[in-house]
Design a protein with these regions (language model features):
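Active-site loop/helix belt of alpha/beta enzymes
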Residues: 1-109
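Charged (often Lys/Glu-rich) extended helix/loop segments that serve as interaction or gating elements
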Residues: 70, 80-224
Length: 224
């Protein structure tokens, strides 16, 4: 017999979508199960904590408390009179870690075609996760460059090493950079590690910063 329900949707993070999700799960449980389920798993697909520059690109990003009120609140009310209440599960993996993983990459070369600069770095959009295809990542520049070539402000695309047209990490980058500069892109913890194929270069090492400010290698660089 069916002892629980599981729903996992990645592309609907708004609070209205989450209300529909829990409403439909409860409807399925009432309609098709002989008794109350042991558990209801609502999966993931929530907004997590973000830098202000990234959260500003969304119309509304609910907080964890907002999700809890809708999902847990609706479920608690639905089973208020039940002797045995289902356990509520959630799977907020990317939701929790995305903000706390950054990609540190170096400018390799700069090429200008007509009035557009293409800045190639020593990483690719595979290292950032698919968020770069939809939004502009928060970033920080370490001015380490010694090259003579500089990019054109507001007419620059940051491109990855695959040289594929879709390998664009940042369109219309708003600052000028030069060869050798280091760019740190934030909020890349959404499947950016496991989804990176060994194409052109294997995956990079992962470093963790301790509370004392020391760097600790927690995953070595991949080799062929």
């Amino acid at each position: 017999s069916v002892c629980g329900l599981h729903c996992h949707i990645s592309r609907a993070r708004g609070i209205v979508a989450w209300q529909k999700r829990i409403d439909n799960l409860l409807h399925v449980a009432d309609t098709y199960l002989e008794k109350n389920p042991d558990f209801i798993d609502v999966g993931s697909g929530m907004f997590g904590e973000m830098d202000s520059s990234l959260s500003a690109q969304f119309e509304a990003a609910p907080s964890y408390e907002d999700y809890a009120k809708v999902v847990a609140g609706t479920m608690a009310k639905h089973y208020e009179q039940a002797t045995k209440k289902p356990i509520l599960f959630s799977e907020p993996g990317t939701t929790l870690i995305a903000k706390y993983l950054s990609l540190v990459t170096t400018v390799d070369n700069i090429k200008t075609i007509k009035d557009r600069c293409f800045v190639t770095v020593d990483s690719s959009y595979y290292n950032t996760g698919e968020i770069v295809l939809m939004k502009k990542l928060p970033y920080r520049i370490v001015r380490n460059g010694k090259g003579d070539t500089r990019s054109i402000v507001k007419k620059t695309n940051i491109m990855g090493f695959t040289c594929l047209e879709q390998d664009c990490i940042y369109t219309d980058f708003p600052e000028s950079v030069q060869e050798g500069d280091i760019i740190e892109f934030g909020n890349v913890g959404g499947y950016s590690i496991v989804s990176k194929p060994p194409f052109i270069q294997p995956n990079c090492k992962i470093l963790s910063i301790t509370p004392e400010g020391d760097l600790v290698e927690i995953k070595r660089q991949e080799t062929y």
